[in-house]
Amino acid sequence: MHRVAMCIVSSGIDGDAGGAWPCRAGVVKCGEAPLKQEPPMPLPDITARINASTTAAGRSPSSVHLIAVSKVQPNDRVEAVLQEGHRVFGENRVQEADSKWPGFRELYDGIDLHLIGPLQSNKVRQAFDLFQTIHSVDRPKLAKAIARIADEIGHCPDVFLQVNTGEEDQKAGVSPDQADAFIAECRALALPVKGLMCIPPADEESSLHFALLAKIAARNDLAGLSMGMSGDFESAIAQGATHIRVGSAIFGERQYG
């Protein structure tokens, strides 16, 4: 059985009164308080912004799923969000998720974990044990590996297919002109394709990429759109996002290193 190591934090941040918290090597050292950062936005404020955006778009607030992106976040911050009742989280790496979430699942019921970062083919089986949804199916080789493991064990996480809407060399995902064929291939493999995911270029207007992703999804009868992050999720909702991936706005700035 997995266990999350505990550390004693003598004084907390972001409203935390201190106490015993799970800790992860390399982010929060046992016996030390986390580094002080700018306070995150209260979760109810994020929810209010989502509600306002969905109302403006003529949609129900329940049509948008808030994924709290906890990658590289100190576990005291993650625990604080869990204590507020939120249960939908996103991680970027299988290894980090495996070091963190089995322990939290011993303490909290109903955790819904989403993989939003790149997945290596040799990590697929491990990902099946951790995640309910994989947002980053970005190439045929990975799709085939997922289908093979699903056949072996009899179940499969929901999947989103990643489209490189900006056609950037440094980003994963199929190009927009390859998306229709990739969707068809994944469906032929009997993968539970729920929608599409994109990460717009940092120096371009996000809404143009959200609109492109929505157009590709619509012509392929896909309802799910995983798009929008802390700085642009309201624009994504206006373009039809069903899953928004919000990290720093909830948890504060990440602590790398």
Give the label of every model feature segment.
Residues S11, P34-Q37:
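Composition-driven detection of intrinsically disordered, low-complexity segments
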Residues M1-I13:
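Extreme N-terminal basic, low-complexity initiation segments
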Residues C7, C30-G31:
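N-terminal polybasic/positive-inside topogenic patches
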Residues K36-A223, M229-G231, I237-Q239, E253:
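Conserved alpha/beta-domain cores
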Residues I237-G257:
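Short, basic/aromatic-enriched C-terminal tail that caps enzymatic domains
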